[in-house]
Curated annotation (Swiss-Prot):
InterPro entries from the UniProt entry: Ribosomal_bL33 (IPR001705), Ribosomal_bL33_sf (IPR038584), Ribosomal_zn-bd (IPR011332)
MF term (GO), any: structural constituent of ribosome
Keyword set, alphabetical order: Ribonucleoprotein, Ribosomal protein
Protein name, entry field: Large ribosomal subunit protein bL33A
Species: Geobacillus kaustophilus (strain HTA426)
Homology family: Belongs to the bacterial ribosomal protein bL33 family.
Pfam families noted in UniProt: Ribosomal_L33
SUPFAM superfamilies: Zn-binding ribosomal proteins (SSF57829)
Length: 49
C-alpha cells in the first residue's frame, strides 16, 4: 500500500510536488532533485511531515 507525501524545496520551502511512498519505508525521508518554479532552478526537494 502507498501513502501520499508532499515534497518541499529545501531553499525556499515551497511545496511543489506530491509523491507516493510505500508504507514499509516510513523511517526514510524521500529526497529528489526537482525543478522549483519559485527559485527558477533545479533544487533538492525533501519530504515534509
Amino acid at each position: 500500500m502507498r501513502q501520499k507525501v508532499t515534497l518541499a524545496c529545501v531553499q525556499c520551502a515551497s511545496r511543489n510536488y506530491t509523491a507516493a511512498k510505500q508504507i514499509r519505508r516510513l523511517g526514510e525521508r524521500l529526497m529528489a532533485n526537482k525543478f522549483c518554479s519559485t527559485c527558477n532552478k533545479h533544487t533538492i526537494h525533501r519530504e515534509t511531515k
